[in-house]
């Protein structure tokens, strides 16, 4: 037990300095050096400009991109959240049917049984960039046809490219027993950079619908 008020004050100031300044500063500096991209929030940089983060989903509505999970907030990066409905609320079923119809319309040729439920349900944050592996694979035919229409590459060539891309960015949320998922932001940025680097798209404003 510290009896002297002066000693107690000194100890408090030392702990305040170490835990409130020194430790956070050292940790931040180490993180910036060891993981520079992660420490900055994994920003998406195109032509030297930041256009978002790989950690936050955005609305990729064009047919040449992988589509994310539904969002209750319209992918608004300034907020996060979901609908205030319980699972037993009839509105949840209505929304699921709506998302199912939209997904089938955007991806003709697939069956409803092929669609993972996560692709038909909104995430808790509304900004989840990860989708199930199956949710990415069933979008490849649609994307391949769309990319073929604006490039000289065949549909089969695009299918191979996209399959390799999905495999590259597929991760498992838990080792051995976890499910496989893929971050669509990495997939779509790769597609965008390929098209821009090869002259198929001049700028972000010239992305086809």
Curated annotation (Swiss-Prot):
<feature type="transmembrane region" description="Helical">
    <location>
        <begin position="10"/>
        <end position="30"/>
    </location>
</feature>
<keyword id="KW-0406">Ion transport</keyword>
<keyword id="KW-1133">Transmembrane helix</keyword>
<dbReference type="Pfam" id="PF02669">
    <property type="entry name" value="KdpC"/>
</dbReference>
<comment type="similarity">
    <text>Belongs to the KdpC family.</text>
</comment>
<comment type="subunit">
    <text>The system is composed of three essential subunits: KdpA, KdpB and KdpC.</text>
</comment>
<comment type="function">
    <text>Part of the high-affinity ATP-driven potassium transport (or Kdp) system, which catalyzes the hydrolysis of ATP coupled with the electrogenic transport of potassium into the cytoplasm. This subunit acts as a catalytic chaperone that increases the ATP-binding affinity of the ATP-hydrolyzing subunit KdpB by the formation of a transient KdpB/KdpC/ATP ternary complex.</text>
</comment>
<protein>
    <recommendedName>
        <fullName>Potassium-transporting ATPase KdpC subunit</fullName>
    </recommendedName>
</protein>
<keyword id="KW-0812">Transmembrane</keyword>
<keyword id="KW-0067">ATP-binding</keyword>
<dbReference type="GO" id="GO:0008556">
    <property type="term" value="F:P-type potassium transmembrane transporter activity"/>
</dbReference>
<keyword id="KW-1003">Cell membrane</keyword>
<dbReference type="GO" id="GO:0005886">
    <property type="term" value="C:plasma membrane"/>
</dbReference>
<keyword id="KW-0813">Transport</keyword>
<keyword id="KW-0472">Membrane</keyword>
<keyword id="KW-0630">Potassium</keyword>
<dbReference type="InterPro" id="IPR003820">
    <property type="entry name" value="KdpC"/>
</dbReference>
<dbReference type="GO" id="GO:0005524">
    <property type="term" value="F:ATP binding"/>
</dbReference>
<keyword id="KW-0547">Nucleotide-binding</keyword>
<keyword id="KW-0633">Potassium transport</keyword>
